[in-house]
Amino acid sequence: MSTPRPHDLLWGLPLSALPDDTPQWALQVVASGQPVVVRRAACADGWVAVGVRGQSRDQRLGTQMRLGDIQRLRSPEALRGCAPSPWPALQALASAAPVLDTCGLAWGPTGGVGYQLATGINVLHLASDLDLVLRAPHPLTRAKALELLDILDCAPCRIDVQLETPAGAVALREWAGCAQRVLLKSPLGARLVSDPWAALECAA
């Protein structure tokens, strides 16, 4: 099994791993066998930071999971296909797929779309956004980012793309903008950088 990365969905979190003050809704989610999502946070060796997702946006619980407890892993890249759907977010996924495929970079849906495609549990609604991750191991020019954003903004709903660099993640919308520095999210926290691919700058 590959090493879990942010946005991957994991199955196998035992109830015994949850803290004593875990809310009832989170206990029910874990007990029902639903997956947890990998978070971007530092952990001790042998552990991964995960989040439990509830029915509403305010139902989110951060915790940790032993790597040895992972029974199954689904990455966003494995969730790219979807059948015709009345939900704007899934329609946006279908329209964005050929555009992103031409980039030559690995990508996939995260958030509610990824969760629904992975579990079959209906969590989307008419106002749902489409969250995507785009793996960018090498620098993407701001001009290219803006070109891609202009195309994606024609979709049936808002699309938010996270560019995953070797140092962390930055929003495509922010990287396509005019600000000299952008917010880079890493396991050690968030910081403003001028180049999200510059490891030395990100570690400074």
Describe each region flagged by the PLM:
Residues D153-K185, G189:
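Conserved catalytic core of two-metal-ion nucleotidyltransferases
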Residues M1-G112, A145, I151-C157, V161:
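Helical scaffold of the NTase/Pol beta-like nucleotidyltransferase catalytic core
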